[in-house]
Amino acid sequence: MILGIGVDLVSVKRIRSASERTGGRLLVRLFTPAERDCCRARRAAYECYAARFAAKEAVFKALGTGFSGCCWHDVEITNGPGGGPVVALTGSAARVAARRGITGVLLSLSHEGDQAVAFAIAVGPSESQRK
């Protein structure tokens, strides 16, 4: 059952300039080591960072919290065996998900030119399945 949805659109140029302005500290604050390793390994690293930032924002929206009370590292976006995005929730994001009955988050990412977009769907058992 769908328990929440979220979408976010991010400018690749904005992520690149913010990273350059902070000497890369922004990337450390926003992304886990696994996320940074994944993006650095790509030819289009900033498109990867922008898509993952959009994904984190979309996941927070799907959880129903916005960014409130969560840490950027509480949502980790990696790639599954087939290459598709996988969401891992930890810390306060995992607690919010458990409280709301969310057992997983489906995620779609895309980027074109200067834009990256993410769409997240929080899923869990229906009320009748939870009883």
Swiss-Prot record:
InterPro entries: 4-PPantetheinyl_Trfase_dom, 4-PPantetheinyl_Trfase_dom_sf, ACPS, Ppantetheine-prot_Trfase_dom. Its EC number is 2.7.8.7. Gene3D superfamilies: 4'-phosphopantetheinyl transferase domain. GO terms for biological process: fatty acid biosynthetic process. Keywords: Cytoplasm, Fatty acid biosynthesis, Fatty acid metabolism, Lipid biosynthesis, Lipid metabolism, Magnesium, Metal-binding, Transferase. It catalyses: apo-[ACP] + CoA = holo-[ACP] + adenosine 3',5'-bisphosphate + H(+). Its cofactor is Mg(2+). NCBIfam families: acpS (TIGR00516), pantethn_trn (TIGR00556), PRK00070.3-2 (NF000832). One of its GO terms (molecular function) is holo-[acyl-carrier-protein] synthase activity. This is Holo-[acyl-carrier-protein] synthase. One of its GO terms (cellular component) is cytoplasm. Belongs to the P-Pant transferase superfamily. AcpS family. Mg(2+) binds at D8, E57. Transfers the 4'-phosphopantetheine moiety from coenzyme A to a Ser of acyl-carrier-protein. It is found in: Cytoplasm.
